[in-house]
Amino acid sequence: MQGETRSISFDGREIRLTTRRYAPQAGGSVLIECGDTAVLVTATRANGREGIDFLPLTCDYEERLYAAGRIPGSFMRRESRPPERATLACRLIDRPIRPLFPSWMRDDLQIVATVMSVDERVPPDVLAVTGASLATLLAKIPFYGPMAAVRVGLLGDDFILNPSYREIERSELDLVVAGTAEGVVMVEAGAQQLPEEDMIEAIDFGYEAVLELIRHQKETIAELGIEQVVPEKPAEDTTVPDYLAKQCTKDIGAVLSQFTLTKAERDSQLDSIKAKAAEAIAALKETDAVRAAVSSNGKLLGNSFKALTKSMMRAQIVKDGKRVDGRSLDQVRPISAAAGVLPKRVHGSGLFQRGLTQVLSTATLGTPSDAQEMDDLNPSNEKHYLHHYNFPPYSVGETRPMRSPGRREIGHGALAERALLPVLPPKESFPYVLRVVSEVLSSNGSTSMGSVCGSTLALMDAGVPIAAPVAGAAMGLIREGSEVRVLTDIQGIEDFLGDMDFKVAGTEKGITALQMDMKITGLAMKTIGEAVTQARPARLHILEKMLEALDKPRDTMSPHAPRRLSFRIDPELIGTVIGPGGRTIKGITERTNTKIDIEDTGIVTVASHDGAAAEEAQKIIEGLTRRVSEGEYFDGKVTRVIPIGAFVEILPGKEGMIHISQLSDQRVEKVEDVVNVGDEVRVRVREIDNRGRINLTLRGVPQDGSDPQPTVILPIGES
């Protein structure tokens, strides 16, 4: 079980690649290590499936909490459903590697990345992407690789490769670039309103590092004596495609050039043309080659018709510069936007529509206890801003069972979440947990960017003081030979038949989120730069339309949103506020009908639907944590009487005792002769003993309202 280990130097670090030791029955496996982070990646190929017309590729990213020396917190104490960040890592592997398999492949493929050990200085996700490529090469699966990925951060004016978790938190940029020797195949980024030129430079910086990792992969398989399997497309029977080209080209061209057709009308006419072709084929002799081919493969006619439509639409864009809806290449579809479309029981709402894509977003304000706890390998264990994306079947006119969110929904929600994070107020000044839900009511392309726009409107409608509004647009690409056309605001058919889906979100100042997926094996940096640059005027146009609906965050929140106060106390006094067994804080919440959260740093957050109740709770806590000095005067209320004295509440939640000898300058036989429960008295702090107990006195303290003035008045709500 010795295996083969190869060490490579990359950006001043050592990366170790161990092959032929682990998972011997997998098609290919590699343990890729950097620092104390180790990821085992396997690639396995099974026999092909009959009757399918897609590549059955599955990518899995498995986090094991033993990798961080932890035991799962679930009842069964084992990992269950993958956490959200693991799902996003699955997509990070899938998106760059899927276009590198030949489109005609029908074999079952599975790539599994298992995090075996994690080092906070080396996030494992980009190692898993590079490992997936090497494992595929080792499995001798036909593949247009190698492919590799790196993460790029920006600290000050310097780009850094593969930053640590802590560096990512401080970085103005969190960018993942994946590519082949031919070009970039995937980009994923979150940024602090980064200018377009800086983003382009960062992608270029990352791609140069990707090329180095590709070289190391080639050297590794060469040392192992493995020859890469280059995909060889099998010979195709062109009988049916040639027949359709002859019979349908004119009719399809007429439909694609009717720019006033709606999506439904265009789809209906194309379906009609396909149905007529099917009827014509059915009328052919049984011995005819076309009829025989269609009869032997139930999906051949549909796939051939789709391929013909795709090539004609692409040719129309490249040659004529016209899209199926008549727009120019850089034109955005008609936009409408509205804020506050739902009753104020919903804290904030926004409706955004672009063409036939319509998204309704809602914003809900919560308390710190509503934050999402993340039970995964990432050191960051809480989320205070959540974005959830829902894509019901009716949004595309279909029927299917309603199930829990899939990887696509989770990925789209994360992208929209990342786009808004840079403009949200810090929790110190706006101590709310925020949840935005985007309901896709109608889909015809770019629903994730519609969710970004709807989220902005919903947050502003909820009174969240965001730093700037955020909008987004999806860019597309058609590449035919040396001819390349970049499309602004692609709709569904252009996404489906095009070569790229490039989503860019940001403010007027710069980019906050970016995601690029390819259907080709690489894109030149020049074209990426054109797409990023072309997205800016589209984004500014969309922002202008959104601001016509609501130009700034509302000054007031929904009356049904919780009112919150945030203040700081001495961390050493947190125990005083909580009390034995939590009795003190429980008593405050019950008395004031509020929700109280205390952080280890001493930040206290009080939430209530009644502002006065929140203020009362604040006064009680401040009273509990206020340091009392000897000689101070207070107005207070007698709360208890005992034979040797009386207790007086001098601050909310804080009592002192007047010994019977301190009730008067004269001898007092019975405490009740001077004070009774409920009496309001002015007292002076006589001393604070070594156990922190406050001893009070009435002796020499005027009770007629004359000076000296008390330091603190009675608690709020008392009389």
UniProtKB/Swiss-Prot annotation:
Its cofactor is Mg(2+). Gene3D superfamilies: GHMP Kinase, N-terminal domain, K Homology domain, type 1, Nucleic acid-binding proteins. Mg(2+) binds at D495, D501. It catalyses: RNA(n+1) + phosphate = RNA(n) + a ribonucleoside 5'-diphosphate. PANTHER family: POLYRIBONUCLEOTIDE NUCLEOTIDYLTRANSFERASE (PTHR11252), POLYRIBONUCLEOTIDE NUCLEOTIDYLTRANSFERASE 1, MITOCHONDRIAL (PTHR11252:SF0). Involved in mRNA degradation. Catalyzes the phosphorolysis of single-stranded polyribonucleotides processively in the 3'- to 5'-direction. This is Polyribonucleotide nucleotidyltransferase. The lineage of its organism: Bacteria, Bacillati, Cyanobacteriota, Cyanophyceae, Synechococcales.
